[in-house]
Amino acid sequence: MAVMEFANVSFRYPTSKEQVLKEVSFQVQKGEFIVLCGASGSGKTTLLKHMIKSQIPIGIGSGSMYFAGADIETMDDRVAASQIAYVGQDPEHNMVTDYVWQELAFGLESLGMSVPQMRRRTAEMAEYFGLESLFRKRTAALSGGQKQLVQLAAAMVVQPKLLVLDEPTSQLDPMEAGRFLDTLAKLHEEFGVTIFLSEQRLDGVLPIADRVFVMEDGTVTDTTPRRVGHLLKERHDPVYAALPIAAKTALCCGESGDLPLTVREGKVWLRDYLKAHSEVSLETIVERITKMAPEISVSEYFGNADIEKPDIQR
C-alpha cells in the first residue's frame, strides 16, 4: 500500500479561474525520498498543502488524496498530526514558542503525551540533532539554519511516517543549506522515514533522491534523478540552472543516457568521454559549457574534479 497517493486531484482557488493543480496522480511508497521541483508558480506549495489535512486550502477541487489508504480529508485530526509532519520555508513564521525545548515538546503536548514521555523524546531528538547547547535558548536568538534545524527536530519528535518539506533551505545561506540537507539524508538513511521534499537546490538532493517529480503549469511528471536533466533541458525549464554541475556538463556534451550527479561521477564521465572522443579537446568542452551553461563556474568544477588535461587526453 502506498504511503501517499493522489488520484486525479485538481484544484483552483475561489478568486481564480485558473486551475493550480490539473488531474494530478501519483503514488509514493514507504521509505522513498521524493524531490519535487518546478518553476515558481507551477503549483508546488499548493500540492504540498493537499498532503497536510490542517493546511488543505479552501477552493474548488476534485479527486482524492490518501495516506496509507485513508482519505486525508476525513482522517482523524490526531492521527493526521502524528503521522504526517511538515517543515515550511520560513522558520521565523513556523516557530510557535519562545524556547527551543518548548518548540520540541509542542507537538507532543498537542498529542496528549505524558510529561515523562515528552522529556525522553525531546532529549533524544536534541541529542540526535546536536541541539543540546541550544536546548534552553530562546528561539529568537537562533540563526536561520539553527531555527530550521529545530523545526526539523520538532517535526521528527512525533515519529511521523511521512515528512513533507516545502523548500526548507530557501532562506538559508549555502553552508547552512548544505548542513540541513546532509541532516535530512542522514534521517532518511537511519530512520527510514518517507520524505517528500520541494527543493530548488537540486545539486544537494538529486544524489540521494529515489524519484523526482517535476511540476509545470499544475501537472506532475515523474522521472528519476539521472533523467530529470533531459526533461528540464527539453522544456527549457528555468530549474535546469539548478542541476548539479556534473549533469549539466554531460548534457552540454550531448549525453543522452543517465547523467552523472556528483563531482566524482562527473570526473569519471568526462574522462571516459574524452577517451571515446579523441577529436574533442578539454578546451572545446569548456567553451561548449561556457556557452550553453554560463552559470557554471568551469574552473571551479574542473579544479574540484581534480582533472588534469595531460592525464585524460592521453
Which sequence ranges carry the predicted segments?
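Conserved ABC transporter NBD signature motif
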Residues: 60-71, 313
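ABC ATPase NBD coupling module
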Residues: 71-85
